[in-house]
Structure formats: C-alpha cells, structure tokens
Amino acid sequence: MSGKANASKKNAQQLKRNPKRKKDNEEVVLSENKVRNTVKKNKNHLKDLSSEGQTKHTNLKHGKTAASKRKTWQPLSKSTRDHLQTMMESVIMTILSNSIKEKEEIQYHLNFLKKRLLQQCETLKVPPKKMEDLTNVSSLLNMERARDKANEEGLALLQEEIDKMVETTELMTGNIQSLKNKIQILASEVEEEEERVKQMHQINSSGVLSLPELSQKTLKAPTLQKEILALIPNQNALLKDLDILHNSSQMKSMSTFIEEAYKKLDAS
C-alpha cells in the first residue's frame, strides 16, 4: 500500500511539474468515457436490432403465404425509375430554392436519400398490376396535361367571345344613345315646325282658321266641271258612261280599298 501511495505521489508531482502531460491524461480519460458511451449505445442498438429481427421473423411467417404470388412480380422499368428520379430532383430543387440555413448539409442528405432510394428501386419487384399503374403514370400525366391545355384553350375562346359580346353591347349602347339624341333633335324640330304652322295659319284661341274671305266674283264663276263639259260635244252620253263606270263592281271595290287604306293610314 505504501508503494502505491508513493507512486501516486510521484505521478502528482510529475503532473504539477509537466502541465502538458496533465492535459494529455485528461484527454485520454475523456476518450475512454466516449468509448464507454459508444459501447453502451452499441449494446442498446444490438438489443433493438434483435427485437427488430424478431418482428421481421414474425412478419416473414405471415408473408410465407404470399411467396407464390411474389414469383410473378417484376422489377421496375427504367422509364419508371427515371420518372421517379426527375420527380425527386424537382422536389429537392424546390426545397433548396427556399432560403434555409445549412443548405449544403440538407442537399447532401437529400441526395444521399435519393441515391439510396434509386438503388433500392433497381432491385425492387412489384406486382404486375402495380407495374401497369406505375408505367401509366407518364401517359396519365400527359393526358391530364392535354386536358388542361384543352380547358385553357376553351377558356381563351370563351374569353374572346365574351370580349366580342361586350364590344357589341358597347356599340349597341352607343347607337341607342345616338338614336335618343336624334329623336330629341327631331322632336325639337317638330315643335319648331308646329310653331311655324301656327304662326302661318294664325290659329286663334277658339281653334278656327282665320282665312281671307272669298270675293263674290270667285263664287259666281263657273266650276271646272262645267268648263270641261262645255268643251265636250256629247255631254249626256259621257255622263251616262261615267255613271255606269261609277256604279260598277270594280269601281266599288276600288273605292272600298281606298277607304280601307285611308282608315289604316289614319289609325297609324
């Protein structure tokens, strides 16, 4: 015991004399602690792995029934893997486009995950039905894009038709306004014309026209009919012919037609 005490005293004296050696010893102690911690972690990890192995073993028991079906499974096609790669790259670019911290570490981590996933997809086998769904993704995407394009074109045509209808409506509104202005102008012109007619005929308050009186000479003058008959030698025969023509059915129908026409004109 005295030898161990002397050795510890010597070590203490050496550490006091050489502080650098003291630092090295402290680092050694820290490294030993790290090793112990890692060993403990590895032990726990092994326990977890053993539990996971047990669960996997039970899952394999349940999956033995589907082993015959797995024989028909097929690996993923190259086009599907390429499509998956492009999708992942676009997602990575979208994530990295945002202003985030530690961008390089995130990029490295995402690229590593992408690489791991693509490596798994190279050996992955899927059922034929799922394979058809995966291979039809690009065609379905193209169909949806074509449908979206058709919808956009239809919307553009509808917008053009709406613009044309709006333009025609504006033109019709302008025409209606111009017609209203013309009607107002015509109404004012009609009022002015009525005023002129009133001034010309000098209509009094009773509504009777104040026309100039006819002279006695004009009243005693022969009528135009008498003057015309005086020029015809056989007046009686002409009067009979005129009477027959006046009482004929053609003349009566013509007179009724003229009366109806006048009635319609008066009604309008």
Curated annotation (Swiss-Prot):
State if Nucleotide-binding is listed as a keyword: no
Domain of life here? Eukaryota
List locations, semicolon-separated: Nucleus; Chromosome, Centromere
Any one GO BP annotation for this protein: positive regulation of protein localization to kinetochore
Record keyword Lyase present: no
Q: Which residues form a coiled coil?
A: 170-206
| CC annotations in GO | actin cytoskeleton; cytosol; inner kinetochore; nucleoplasm; nucleus
Q: Spans of biased composition, class Basic residues?
A: 58-72
**Phosphoserine modified-residue sites:** 31, 50, 249
Key words, A-Z: Centromere, Chromosome, Coiled coil, Nucleus, Phosphoprotein
Reproduce the UniProt comment on modification after translation: Phosphorylation at Ser-50 is essential for CENPE recruitment to kinetochores and orderly chromosome congression.
Residue ranges for the region (Disordered) are 1-80
How does this chain assemble? Component of the CENPA-CAD complex, composed of CENPI, CENPK, CENPL, CENPO, CENPP, CENPQ, CENPR and CENPS. The CENPA-CAD complex interacts with the CENPA-NAC complex, at least composed of CENPA, CENPC, CENPH, CENPM, CENPN, CENPT and CENPU.
**PANTHER family with a match to the protein in the record:** CENTROMERE PROTEIN Q
**Family membership noted in the UniProt record:** Belongs to the CENP-Q/OKP1 family.
Q: What's this chain's function?
A: Component of the CENPA-CAD (nucleosome distal) complex, a complex recruited to centromeres which is involved in assembly of kinetochore proteins, mitotic progression and chromosome segregation. May be involved in incorporation of newly synthesized CENPA into centromeres via its interaction with the CENPA-NAC complex. Plays an important role in chromosome congression and in the recruitment of CENP-O complex (which comprises CENPO, CENPP, CENPQ and CENPU), CENPE and PLK1 to the kinetochores.
- By what name is this protein known? Centromere protein Q
Q: What species is this protein from?
A: Homo sapiens (Human)
Designated gene of the protein: CENPQ
